[in-house]
């Protein structure tokens, strides 16, 4: 007999931190875990790659799902802000370079990811956005795609076009 608890091993993600409880089928995904001081907590390509890689790794096919059982993913942030949206520095760089293909690729990745989250990773996952800091632009869109939003008092949410 041992007192050692077996923990789920999760692949390390350079731009986010994941904590999982396999017994309760719950996952906590913290964006911006390695964000350097002064960096903007936004959807950099590396963060998006990590997020979609993790979410795809826990997405079950229909025949793998347990009827009547929901899984949960909480999306949070290790930064002062939840997420401030698009990577504006990348946008400026790609626009100056006339790199339409990379801009379209970035946009498609955002749209596909938000759709995957909105559909509950295929239907058996409830996505919860935990806003302990501002959610602006695409960060707010991510929160809106979740089935539940929990926000601390004083958190600002909004879109630049409003």
Each model region followed by its residue ranges:
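A structural preference for short, pocket-lining loop segments at secondary-structure junctions
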Residues: 29, 50-98, 112-128, 154-155
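Glycine-rich beta-to-alpha active-site loop
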Residues: 117-162
